[in-house]
């Protein structure tokens, strides 16, 4: 291509006023551009425009120059140049809007950040491409955990294009940010809207899961049960999520006077005591049975739990404490003390309340340390 450049330059120098020189100038700009020499390409096209302003080649050069400036992400410079040579009519505001966005999007898509998109949003407050520009700003900022920047960008998309192609993902991310910021009322309303609008299964599930967690946090137990039932009917539910949802529903049942429903969920969860939900459920099931005077059943539940074992020492210790209550209830205080003393001697050092619970119980049984 270097030989081509030499030839075109020579042609322009030897026949500066000919049609061949004008066409050579266009070819020179194209060769430079195709070989990544954008500054040289700009200079070549500008030379054609300035030397032969009324020619057809000058009009073509303006159009080709546009592509070079878009590639350089320098549409402002393109507009300024056209103004300087009296050709601003060839780049109306609507076209500059489009070109500026194209250049900014290209920069973003090639991994060079969102600065150009942010500049576009500032320069064109009524621009035709504010929706995608804000979406990409939000997406990149969310990935970088810059939630303060991502939230208004996603909010703009959701507010100004509620049914557009970017709306669902923008709403999903907006809700996630609101949840992370503990703005639960706004997040719940957003998740509820997302549940209705979502066409992507993952987004619908995320919406329901968000609603479940917020409802549980706010002790809205009826809502917890309703949303949990919807989630549990889904086919694509990971084992971990299924356990979390079952546990939340059991807790809601228990707090609304539906103990047997809660016990059913705890019983299901207690089959896997490797998980925190399973271990806690095994204990809660036994405690529920004990409180309802099903002492033998509670003992059986505890023995099953103890035999299975669990990595969650706290709930295993609570099971031993409850076992001591069972022995005490039967009048077997010596056995109860043995359980408690053994637990005290073997429970790993911890900042939880197990040791204080043991000491309190031993004191009640008439033995102090």
Which residue ranges define each predicted feature?
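Acidic, polar-rich low-complexity tracts and alpha-helical solenoid repeat scaffolds
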Residues: 1-369
């Amino acid at each position: 291509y270097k030989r081509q450049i030499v030839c075109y330059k020579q042609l322009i120098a030897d026949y500066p006023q000919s049609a061949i020189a004008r066409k050579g100038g266009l070819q020179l700009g194209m060769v430079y551009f195709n070989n990544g020499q954008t500054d040289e390409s700009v200079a070549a096209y500008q030379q054609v425009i300035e030397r032969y302003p009324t020619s057809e080649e000058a009009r073509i050069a303006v159009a080709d120059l546009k592509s070079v400036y878009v590639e350089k992400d320098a549409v402002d410079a393109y507009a300024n140049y056209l103004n300087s040579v009296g050709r601003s009519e060839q780049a109306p505001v609507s076209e500059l809007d489009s070109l500026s966005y194209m250049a900014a999007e290209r920069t973003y898509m090639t991994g060079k950040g969102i600065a150009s998109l942010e500049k576009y949003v500032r320069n064109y407050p009524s621009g035709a491409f504010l929706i995608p520009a804000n979406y990409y700003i939000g997406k990149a900022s969310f990935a970088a955990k810059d939630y303060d920047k991502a939230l208004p960008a996603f909010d703009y998309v959701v507010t100004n294009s509620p049914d557009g192609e970017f709306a669902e993902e923008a709403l999903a991310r907006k809700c996630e940010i609101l949840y992370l910021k503990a703005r639960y009322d706004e997040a719940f309303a957003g998740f509820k809207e997302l549940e209705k609008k979502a066409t992507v299964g993952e987004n619908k599930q995320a919406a329901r899961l968000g609603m479940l967690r917020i409802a549980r946090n706010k002790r809205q137990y009826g809502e917890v049960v309703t949303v949990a039932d919807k989630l549990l009917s889904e086919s694509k539910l990971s084992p971990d999520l299924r356990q979390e949802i079952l546990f939340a529903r059991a807790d809601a049942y228990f707090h609304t006077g539906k103990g047997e429903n809660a016990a059913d969920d705890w019983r299901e969860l207690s089959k896997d005591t490797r998980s925190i939900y399973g271990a806690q459920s095994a204990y809660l099931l036994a405690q529920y049975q004990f409180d309802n005077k099903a002492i033998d059943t509670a003992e059986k539940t505890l023995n099953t739990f103890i035999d299975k074992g669990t990595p969650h020492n706290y709930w295993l210790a609570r099971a031993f404490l409850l076992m001591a209550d069972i022995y005490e209830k039967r009048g077997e205080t010596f056995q109860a003390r043995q359980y408690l003393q053994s637990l005290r001697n073997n429970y790993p050092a911890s900042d939880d309340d197990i040791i204080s619970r043991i000491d309190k119980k031993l004191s009640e049984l008439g033995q102090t340390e």
